[in-house]
Regions:
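Residue-level recognition of alpha-helix initiation/capping sites
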Residues: 28, 54, 100, 182, ...
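Acidic, Mg2+-coordinating active-site environments of NTP-dependent enzymes
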Residues: 41, 112-118, 139-221
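Short polar catalytic/cofactor-binding loops
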Residues: 49-50, 76
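Catalytic cores of large soluble enzymes that bind and process phosphate-bearing ligands
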Residues: 12-19, 51, 94-98, 154, ...
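Active-site signature of alpha/beta-hydrolase-fold catalytic machinery across serine-
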Residues: 57-61, 218
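ATP-dependent carboxylate-amine ligase catalytic core
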Residues: 34-41, 60-142, 146-164, 185
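N-terminal glycine-rich "phosphate-gripper" loop used for MgATP/nucleotide binding
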Residues: 26, 123, 181
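Short, basic phosphate-binding NTP loop
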Residues: 2-47, 54-58, 66, 202
Length: 221
């Protein structure tokens, strides 16, 4: 059986059409994600070296008590989804954690008719922190619990490396709630650049549970 001859031009055109189809599909997927994300009017992105999970849970609980339909996602070893009725279910993963799962989270938020999404930041690398906020979450509120020298192999060992990385989740024209211990130059400078209204929450000297609670309640006031 003789295969039909395909010229270089025909092959090029076939590849070009295939690439155009992929680009069109990606564009459609991006528009669908943006529509779902924007259907959730309040999006709270919780970041920091320690206390993110506890703070995200507390924010969700306080907002539910105020009658809001809140969907919360925590990350870590055992990621959980906290539904608007307060019940919990494991967040399914089929491979390593990836910021792309925020797309699936917002799909679930729309399905749950949530008017508030609380998302624990799951990125460590600066480029992923930036991409998560810029392309996936577009938070209305950012919360920073602290900026301590964790993951130095990723963010570097400079005293302000963690702050420089964490600052990348600060949203444009949003609101920032930052614990006073984390209110350092990279965080505050980024907030100014992003025209983000900043609230510095005094937590110095408090036990970490009390610190998380005060920060969470400040967001909900």
């Amino acid at each position: 059986m003789t295969l039909p001859y395909i010229s270089d031009i025909q092959l090029f055109l076939a590849v070009l059409v295939s690439c155009a189809g992929v680009i069109a599909w990606l564009g459609l997927a991006a528009r669908l994600h943006h529509a779902r994300r924007n259907a959730v009017p309040v999006r709270i992105h919780v970041a920091g070296s320690r206390g993110k999970t506890t703070t995200a849970r507390m924010i969700g609980a306080a907002l539910r008590a105020n009658g809001k339909r809140v969907l919360v996602k925590t990350t870590g070893t055992d990621p959980m989804l906290i539904l608007p009725d307060g019940s919990e279910q494991p967040w399914p993963r089929w491979g390593p954690p990836t910021i792309a799962e925020q797309v699936r989270f917002f799909r679930e938020a729309v399905r749950q008719k949530a008017d508030v999404a609380v998302i624990e930041s799951m990125a460590i690398e600066p480029e992923y922190l930036w991409a998560s906020e810029e392309y996936l979450v577009r938070a209305t509120h950012a919360v920073v619990t602290n900026v301590r020298p964790d993951h130095v192999e990723v963010v570097g060992d400079h005293p302000l490396s963690a702050a420089n990385a964490t600052a990348l989740i600060i949203p444009r024209n949003g609101q920032l709630f930052v614990a006073d211990e984390a209110a350092v130059a990279p965080i505050l400078d980024r907030a100014t650049q992003c025209k983000c209204q900043t609230t510095i929450v005094p937590v110095a000297g408090l036990h970490h549970d009390q610190s998380n609670r005060r920060l969470a309640l400040s967001v909900c006031d």
